[in-house]
C-alpha cells in the first residue's frame, strides 16, 4: 500500500461509520457489462459471510434504510477486524510501498516495489477504482489487467461530486456532515 496508513477509504466510508454490507444485495443491484461475474462473486462470498465475520469480532452494528449495515461506533472497528484477519492469516501489510512492476515468473509472480523485490505463488490485487484520486485511487489495476491481457470493460462513474457555485456552497456549508434520505429523479 503506498499510503502511510491502511484503510483510508474504509475509514471515510459511511460518514466514518462504514456502510459495510447490505444483506439485501443481489446481482440485480450491480450494473455491469458482465452480469455473470456478480452472480459468481456473490455466490462465493455473500453479505451474510461478511456479517458473520463482523459478529465474530463483536462489532456492534445497526441497520439503516433498505438493509444498509453500519458500525454503531466507528469504521475503525472494521479496519481493525480486517487487519486482525490479515495477521491471523500470516499476511504482511507493507505501507509506504508502491508496486512498480509485476511480471509472471515460473510458478508465480515477481513484484518490483519501492522497497525491493517480492515473489509469490499467487497474487490478489486489491486496488479499488478511479473514484477518489485524493485518497490514492489510480488506474494501476487497469494497467496491470491490460499487461496480463485481461479484458477491460468500459468504466462508468459510480461516485460523482456535487459541484456548487461559490455562493451556494457558502450558504450550504452549515449543513456539512448532515445526511437525510433523498431520491434523485
List PLM regions with ranges.
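Short glycine-rich, polar/acidic loop-and-turn segments at beta strand-coil junctions
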Residues: 1-4, 24, 57-58, 97
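Predominantly flavin-linked oxidoreductase catalytic cores and closely associated redox partners
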Residues: 2, 12, 76-77, 81-185
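Short N-terminal binding/cap micro-motifs at the start of the first secondary-structure element
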Residues: 5-9
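Short, flexible micro-motifs
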Residues: 10, 17-19, 70, 131-132
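Short capping/connector residues at structural and topological boundaries
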Residues: 11, 15-17, 23-25, 35, ...
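Glycine-rich active-site loop/strand segments that organize a redox cofactor
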Residues: 15-65
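Flexible, glycine/proline-enriched loop segments at strand-loop-helix junctions
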Residues: 37-41, 68-73, 127-135
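An accessory alpha-helical subdomain
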Residues: 45-55, 65-89
Amino acid at each position: 500500500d503506498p499510503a502511510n496508513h491502511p484503510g483510508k477509504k474504509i475509514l471515510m466510508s459511511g460518514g466514518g461509520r462504514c456502510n459495510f454490507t447490505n444483506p439485501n444485495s443481489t446481482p440485480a443491484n450491480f450494473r455491469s457489462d458482465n452480469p455473470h461475474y456478480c452472480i459468481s462473486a456473490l455466490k462465493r462470498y455473500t453479505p451474510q459471510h461478511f456479517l458473520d465475520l463482523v459478529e465474530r469480532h463483536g462489532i456492534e452494528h445497526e441497520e439503516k434504510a433498505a438493509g444498509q449495515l453500519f458500525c454503531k461506533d466507528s469504521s475503525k472497528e472494521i479496519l481493525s477486524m480486517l487487519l486482525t484477519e490479515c495477521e491471523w492469516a500470516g499476511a504482511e501489510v507493507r505501507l509506504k510501498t508502491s508496486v512498480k512492476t509485476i511480471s509472471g515468473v515460473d510458478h508465480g509472480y515477481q513484484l518490483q516495489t519501492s522497497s525491493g523485490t517480492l515473489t509469490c505463488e499467487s497474487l490478489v490485487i486489491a486496488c479499488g477504482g478511479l473514484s477518489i484520486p485524493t485518497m490514492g485511487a489510480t488506474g494501476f489495476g487497469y494497467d496491470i489487467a491490460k499487461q496480463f491481457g485481461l479484458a477491460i470493460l468500459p468504466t462508468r462513474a459510480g461516485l460523482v461530486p456535487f459541484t456548487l457555485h461559490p455562493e451556494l456552497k457558502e450558504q450550504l456549508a452549515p449543513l456539512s456532515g448532515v445526511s437525510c434520505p433523498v431520491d434523485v429523479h
